[in-house]
From Swiss-Prot:
Its main location: cytoplasm. This is Choline kinase alpha. One of its GO terms (biological process) is lipid droplet disassembly. Plays a key role in phospholipid biosynthesis by catalyzing the phosphorylation of free choline to phosphocholine, the first step in phosphatidylcholine biosynthesis. Also phosphorylates ethanolamine, thereby contributing to phosphatidylethanolamine biosynthesis. Has higher activity with choline. Pathway: Phospholipid metabolism; phosphatidylcholine biosynthesis; phosphocholine from choline: step 1/1; Phospholipid metabolism; phosphatidylethanolamine biosynthesis; phosphatidylethanolamine from ethanolamine: step 1/3. Phosphocholine binds at G115, L116, S117. GO terms for molecular function: ATP binding; choline kinase activity; cholinesterase activity; ethanolamine kinase activity; identical protein binding; protein homodimerization activity; protein tyrosine kinase activity. It is an enzyme of class 2 (transferase). It catalyses: choline + ATP = phosphocholine + ADP + H(+); ethanolamine + ATP = phosphoethanolamine + ADP + H(+). Coiled coil: none annotated.
Amino acid sequence: MKTKFCTGGEAEPSPLGLLLSCGGNAAPTPGVGQQRDAAGELESKQLGGRTQPLALPPPPPPPLPLPPPPSPPLADEQPEPRTRRRAYLWCKEFLPGAWRGLREDQFHISVIRGGLSNMLFQCSLPDSIASVGDEPRKVLLRLYGAILKMRSCNKEGSEQAQNENEFQGAEAMVLESVMFAILAERSLGPKLFGIFPQGRLEQFIPSRRLDTEELRLPDISAEIAEKMATFHGMKMPFNKEPKWLFGTMEKYLNQVLRLKFSREARVQQLHKILSYNLPLELENLRSLLQYTRSPVVFCHNDCQEGNILLLEGQENSERRKLMLIDFEYSSYNYRGFDIGNHFCEWMYDYTYEKYPFFRANIQKYPSRKQQLHFISSYLTTFQNDFESLSSEEQFATKEDMLLEVNRFALASHFLWGLWSIVQAKISSIEFGYMEYAQARFEAYFDQKRKLGV
């Protein structure tokens, strides 16, 4: 789960790739050019023919040491009194039945750890309060994170630019809530119980989030592929131009180039990352992806283990045990990014409880065999006639897709690397954002070496 951050003029898309004033339907395009809160400074040529099978050489040792496994999280962690009071009032005012007469001393709330963007809480009725009707007894309270603090990252900009930032931030949240409601109505996501400027109340689904290691389990990987293919097949009433990816990276990069840290350690970390000549790298990446075929579909854009629920009671089901959640980055985008981004997430564990609160291991990137397993499950769901193709046609399709997603994995590293630098400045979530940015750019250059680009 990662926090949105947007800048730019009125003609640019929000981080969701959406414009309230934009309409029209754009056909899928052949290429880019042809169409994870307590420390503010805690901080090829176009594919006309078939390509040879993409060989992924053995990766080098991981750039970061692997700390010991995390200790169990604290139980029933409580929010600060002001947050508790606001949560109580939201639940009392938005939820029906027994919630309406609930006293504050009867209100139960606990912190849900693990979000890198938003603050999450479980709110519930006590066992002593009987239900009146079919009202939920537990709900999830989501409070928006650093997107509400965008001004602080652009203090030197014009008042007009700051106002545009604030408008686009508010627009993004409204549109994400609209998207959330649509997916809920289609039974593709949790129900929406209430929405307000600071966040929303969602259905609390008995479940747990996947662990990073579970992404590589064959049955889990196959179902994620099927869920993603279904997501990609949806028709949504949003801007269908694939502007989100490079529009967002350009905005992040502009912010990063203007950032100033007061802590010397952060200054040195930023200096090291800027020595990579990020503007030139971004243009090289754009040139590479311009000649990489990838259909434009409705993408999740953040399909990591923390955004995939394992449903309680469905653990032994073959194909109905998972649910995708957290759609704040969803937009029409290149398919290769969504899948490549998911593959990148195999390398990162965000559950480590000591600084920098994540572990990275490049060796965990899926092997060619694991990628083909995912791609086969994806194509069987996404492409109705895939299984009727000849074995030669299936092979060629999968080889093209291997090249597609591994190239777009570069964009994943670049995007979240920039994102993390911005978060180091504006986020109040306790996380080693600068260390994470460094890890993503190290992985970016490693992926370039593997691909020979």
